[in-house]
Amino acid sequence: KGKGFWSWASKATSWLTGPQQPGSPLLKKHR
């Protein structure tokens, strides 16, 4: 059920963080 959300989340995260830092604070916050 959350597959679509995760695919969108990963896309949004990579878009938000950009190529600057792959391990952005957003990901750390989410975990």
Swiss-Prot record:
One of its GO terms (cellular component) is extracellular region. It comes from the Bacteria. Keywords: Antibiotic, Antimicrobial, Bacteriocin, Secreted. It is found in: Secreted. The keyword Secreted applies. The keyword DNA-binding does not apply. One of its GO terms (biological process) is defense response to bacterium. Inhibits a wide spectrum of lactic acid bacteria. This is Bacteriocin leucocin-B. It comes from Leuconostoc mesenteroides.
